[in-house]
Amino acid sequence: ASDVYKRQARAIHLGFALTLAFLIFPAVRGKKISILDIIISITGALSCLYIYFFYDDLVNRGGILLVKEIFGFKVPVELIIGATGILILLEATRRAIGLPLVIIAVCFLLFSYFGKYAPDIISHGGLSVKRLVGFQWFDQEAIFGIPIGVSVDFIFLFVLFGALLETAGGGKYFLDLAFAMVGKMRGGPAKAAILGSGMTGMISGSSIANTVTTGTFTIPIMKKTGFSQEKAGAIEVSSSVNG
């Protein structure tokens, strides 16, 4: 039962993320969020919540997508929902991260469909649109696979409590302690970042959450004291991973 709840939690998690993506990132940088963005965000959230509400039916049908007869026409309901969700996710990725990752994702989707035309060493029979959408959107091994699971089980929780810790002054305490110990030394901000990340890592236990939590403080401080943006980021990442 817990496994079922985890899978449903992933759907809620992605739906929440899609909603935020379209409400925070406009279609074009510098533009305001439009009514269309709000509609798309709601549509993306509903595509995810469909999995939450009808998860048992999806499992019982064993990957067969639902087709309903509406006004005498057979409508592939779940094919439409899944395809819509995938397209909205790609657009959210473009807005939040950039076009390169979207291009990579689209290339793999095309490879899944046109696999029989690929070179022999990587060729396969190819997936139909139904199987492709069904696997990508309604299966636990694709979009709702391990990365979303890690985000739900670890990253989100640690980032949330890291934000609470920061609001309560805990993050500042760790950094103040680190700066008090090594701040006057040569390269003090970098050493303080390493110590601060190590101490925060004892609480979070997650390198990614550790980077997000402590990097908010340490990277700007290192940049102010003369470290380049790249070096400051590299120091924070390495110290958070080892911490």
Name each region found by the language model.
Residues D176-G243:
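Hydrophobic transmembrane alpha-helices that form the pore/transport pathway of multi-pass ion
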Residues A11-V28, G44-I51, I80-T93:
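Central hydrophobic cores of alpha-helical transmembrane segments in multi-pass inner-membrane proteins
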Residues F161, L165-L175:
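Juxtamembrane interface elements at the cytosolic ends of transmembrane helices
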Residues D37-S47, I81-L87, L101-I104, A193:
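Hydrophobic alpha-helical transmembrane segments of polytopic
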Residues V28-I64:
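Alpha-helical transmembrane segments and their cytosolic membrane-interface
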Residues K32, N60-L160, L177:
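Hydrophobic transmembrane alpha-helices of multi-pass solute/ion transporters
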Residues A1-Y5:
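Short, small-residue-biased leader/transition segments that mark boundaries at the very start
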